UniProtKB/Swiss-Prot annotation:
PANTHER family: DNA REPAIR PROTEIN RECO
Protein name: DNA repair protein RecO
Gene Ontology cellular-component terms listed: bacterial nucleoid
Organism, as annotated: Nostoc sp. (strain PCC 7120 / SAG 25.82 / UTEX 2576)
Example of a GO biological process term: double-strand break repair
UniProt keywords, alphabetically: DNA damage, DNA recombination, DNA repair
Family statement drawn from the similarity comment of this UniProt entry: Belongs to the RecO family.
Record-linked HAMAP family: RecO
Reported function: Involved in DNA repair and RecF pathway recombination.
UniProt xrefs under SUPFAM superfamilies: ArfGap/RecO-like zinc finger, Nucleic acid-binding proteins
Length: 296
């Protein structure tokens, strides 16, 4: 086995090590997720200082080590300076990095995930300054695509109970559809209510005294009643249904509250399936709460 290898990767996480080093977690096209020491990168004027920063893309020469590999050369080929200049964009980028760190594999090529992450970071960076809720829309779009790549796409076109297509009724302001995280997507509330009524009726019948106990029992398997995690209006479902498209729909600033709802649903869904909280989401909450207060 070669003692050194080349890789192209983007830095997703960095932590201090010793007096002057960093351990950098990098998503590479060729080898997936790797952790490597950036020696001396915390020293003033270190050549690896800026190259070991978050969301920097480098061509790397890495030396194999017993427990941790070591970066010996790094040539920067792409940076995203616009992300650090906007708190909302930075929080959204860190949010995406957390999801990628959960789903990326090690010692396997991850070219599709690498390309997808870079594409969405580029889109976030290119957003015009001041479009705070545009950040939420682009974040939701990116999260949906990352979930789809991992095979965790939420079902947003058909009901998880009836398997029938659900189309939002924009003419009815009271129209609603349920979203069940455990069931994996949207739920027709009429079908859901029907199941609940059936279950209540069955429960009452079981509680009634039976004069004669039959010699046999009939076992009936009822459809499980899903827990409704959220209720969406027609605009919110319409947004959710369009997130599978390669390009995001035109952002309507009158729908800011709807983007908040869509992001919250996708966040809860991602956390459930990834099995861990997205810590950067608290920054998103703080940022958009502050922006909402400033515009009220």
């Amino acid at each position: 086995m070669n003692k050194t290898y080349k890789a192209t990767g983007i830095n997703l996480k960095a932590q201090a090590m010793g007096e002057s080093d960093r351990i950098v977690t990098i998503l590479t096209q060729e080898f997936g997720l790797i952790r490597a020491i950036a020696p001396g990168s915390r020293k003033h004027n270190s050549s690896l200082g800026g190259r070991s920063a978050m969301f920097v893309v480098n061509e790397l020469l890495i030396a194999k080590g017993r427990s941790l590999d070591k970066i010996t050369q790094a040539q920067t080929i792409k940076t995203y300076p616009g992300l650090a200049k906007d708190l909302g964009k930075l929080a959204a980028s860190q949010y995406l990095a957390e999801i990628v760190l959960c789903q990326a594999l090690s010692e396997q090529p991850q070219e599709e995930l690498y390309e997808l992450l870079n594409e969405h970071l580029h889109r976030l960076e290119e957003l015009p300054k001041g479009e705070s809720f545009g950040v939420l829309a682009y974040l939701a779009h990116a999260v949906f695509h990352l979930l789809a790549l991992a095979g965790l796409t939420p079902q947003v076109q058909i009901c998880c109970l009836t398997q029938r297509s659900l189309t939002p009724d924009f003419a009815d302001p009271n129209w609603r559809v349920g979203f069940s995280i455990a069931s994996g997507g949207i739920v027709c509330l009429e079908a859901w209510e029907g199941l609940r009524k059936e279950a209540r009726k069955e429960s009452k019948e079981k509680s009634l005294p039976h004069p004669v106990t039959p010699a046999y029992q009939t076992v009936v398997h009822r459809q499980e009643i899903p827990v409704i995690s959220a209720r969406l209006n027609s605009v919110e479902l319409g947004m959710l249904q369009q997130l599978s498209q390669p390009e995001i729909m035109q952002i309507n600033t009158t729908s800011d509250a709807s983007w908040l709802s869509v992001e919250q649903i996708l966040r809860q869904y991602a956390q459930y399936h990834l099995g861990r909280p997205i810590r950067s989401a608290t920054l998103i909450d703080s940022y958009f709460a502050a922006n909402h207060d400033a515009t009220v």
